[in-house]
Amino acid sequence: MPAMSQNPPLLRPDLAPAPIFDTSRREGQPTIGMVSLGCPKALVDSERILTRLRAEGYAISPDYKGAGAVIVNTCGFLDSAKAESLQAIGEALAENGKVIVTGCLGAEPEYITGAHPSVLAVTGPQQYEQVLDAVHHAVPPSPDPFVDLLPASGVKLTPRHYSYLKISEGCNHACKFCIIPDMRGKLVSRPAHAVIREAEKLVEAGVRELLVISQDTSAYGLDRKFATERGHRAHITDLARDLGQLGAWVRLHYVYPYPHVRDLIPLMAAHGESGGLVLPYLDIPFQHAHPDVLKRMARPAAAARTLDEIAAWRAVCPDITLRSTFIVGYPGETEAEFQTLLDWLDEAQLDRVGCFQYENVKGARANDLPDHVPDDVKQDRWDRFMQKAQAISEAKLAAKVGHRIEVIVDAVDGDGATCRTKADAPEIDGNLFIDEGFEDLAPGDIVSVTVDEAGEYDLWGRL
């Protein structure tokens, strides 16, 4: 059997060297092959993919015959490079039959599948997770005593009972105060089945709460045209419903107030066929309320519409908790515009609020806007805003006194148990404290408590 093709020597002057693989393996170990084409940057991508696969227990095969499947990391820089990539894919299909395509030419999936419709998967450049997921599907990993030292959930920097679940990278918006699109690019959504697979592994490892994050959660799947792959549709409503079936709390963050967010609310309501699958909690970055400020920010929302949306959400799910963040002192913000924000907050009655004083960020377009607000004025507006937000929070928490609610335990020490309600995300929201009868509790426990006391941001209760 022929060895797998390597880079021809004269394709381009910036060509990467032919990869050298460590091909040692144990009996029964799953194997994968790699054909790496193109420039040194592509070679680094191949190295990263192979590093992840080796860490998961895969061996690297030096030839087609010994590989359970073959990854072809393509180049699409020139027409000649595209032709070489198609040729390499065809060779891998002929010699092995199971081929996963990635790399620059993967950004044109129809071009590849038009020539080779039998490839298992096509992913774009730097889409490492999608490549790994395709490998797992084609060549399932097997247990290895050394690999098993790594927790099933991976290396996490959060407590074992909750985990952040990233569903996409990048953002399609062009907010003038933000440089995220410049740093992370346009929206790139993970396949829904890959998200679900990660979530399943987390829950199996003991995670009780999944915190769904991205730059724009409600836009999830837009770049994938909301496609259905392996039984899961890449749309936030479908994804939330699927995640809600796993038995863990599901909390949604960074949700822009698009009209289709209304479809999420029935999943949060206590009643209905799909009710209770998702926590009644939405983290929505409104940023401001005055239409002129929003326009200067280049934000994709208007204050009047958001009030209508809030009313519609609460009509379906009266217990919904709404969290948001705001910027005061944005360039050009007048006292009248700020007062509009205060009036809007009075009407919106948000449960959880964060506020930032505007600061220039290197590379942000807002830096060049006229009429920057003096620091002392920004501080005064922040103080007034937070005073109003605090009063709203205190009143809403006071209304919970005497009620029986469900909480998740975050920590237990000699003084008591620190918990969170369904209305509280870790780190950014409040807590519920239990001072008596907590000795048998452990982090990750979900228990019912009676609320005895309320403060500005926190609650106290008893089992």
Curated annotation (Swiss-Prot):
Primary residence: cytoplasm
Plastid among keywords: no
List of residues binding [4Fe-4S] cluster 1: 39, 75, 104
Stretches for region Disordered: 1-26
Top-rank taxon, per record: Bacteria
Binding site for [4Fe-4S] cluster 2: 171, 175, 178
Family the entry assigns: Belongs to the methylthiotransferase family. RimO subfamily.
Name used for this protein in its record: Ribosomal protein uS12 methylthiotransferase RimO
